Design a protein with these regions (language model features):
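Class I (Rossmann-like) S-adenosyl-L-methionine-dependent methyltransferase catalytic domain
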Residues: 1, 41-47, 195
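Serine-dependent carboxylesterase/thioesterase catalytic core
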Residues: 3-9, 13-18, 22, 26-37, ...
Length: 216
């Protein structure tokens, strides 16, 4: 199966950190294509970034069977919003993401900071969007001084990974974090492949035993 891992960086992330992470290295070693979402609108509305991410995911969906998105910090909010808008994301990983908001006023009065604020209208609006969403792995850094453990937990069912002895930035360079994320992503890929096989068997059963496999 063709599979791609999309990384969405945090606030004002330069993008050059992604190629250096063990997540990317492990993903490529395990046969995943990797893509960095080049977010040049980091200081603009999060909704604009989410819409741009939806467009990218739609394009990748034409050539890949499995799409997993990893969002670090603010990038996780953008990814969750894209999923809520119906982007064909199979799995979502958020790392140090302020799902419950945070008091970031010390970073200045930028509109994006207000959107990430505790109980903000933006966060409430995304949570209220109806529809199914992909499985989510929420990664929490034990020594994160920007996003608390409670703030990093999504408002919906999720798998939680708490990483000891690392902070908000260091967590994406932690090998054990990368290993767990890739194990989770590979298990998700296996589930998707099994569903495709079940669908193919059901389709062939309806058409007759000598019918060719269904094409997607």
């Amino acid at each position: 199966m063709s599979k791609v891992l999309v990384f969405v960086g945090g606030f004002a992330a330069p993008g050059n950190e992604w190629p250096l992470t063990p997540i990317r290295r492990s993903a490529r070693e395990q046969g995943w294509r990797t893509k960095y979402f080049d977010e040049r609108l980091a200081f603009g509305p999060l909704a604009t970034s989410a819409e741009r991410l939806v467009k990218l995911i739609d394009e990748l969906d034409q050539t890949h069977d499995t799409i997993v998105v990893i969002g670090h910090s603010m990038g996780g909010l953008v990814a969750e919003h894209a999923a809520a808008l119906g982007a064909p994301i199979d799995g979502l990983v958020t790392i140090g993401t302020p799902h419950q908001g945070h008091n970031l006023s010390r970073f200045g009065p930028l509109p994006v900071m207000r959107e990430m604020g505790t109980n903000s209208a933006y966060l409430r609006g995304v949570a209220a969007i109806p529809g199914e969403r992909p499985p989510i792995l929420a990664v929490v850094a034990a020594n994160d001084r920007l996003v608390s453990k409670s703030a990093a937990r999504p408002n919906r069912p999720h798998t939680l990974l708490e990483v000891p002895n690392v902070g908000h930035l260091r967590v994406i360079f932690d090998q054990s974090t990368a290993d767990t994320i890739m194990k989770w992503a590979d298990a998700l890929t296996d589930e998707i492949a099994e569903r495709h096989q079940d669908l193919d068997r059901a389709t062939r059963s309806e058409r007759g035993p000598n019918s060719p496999p269904a094409t997607s």
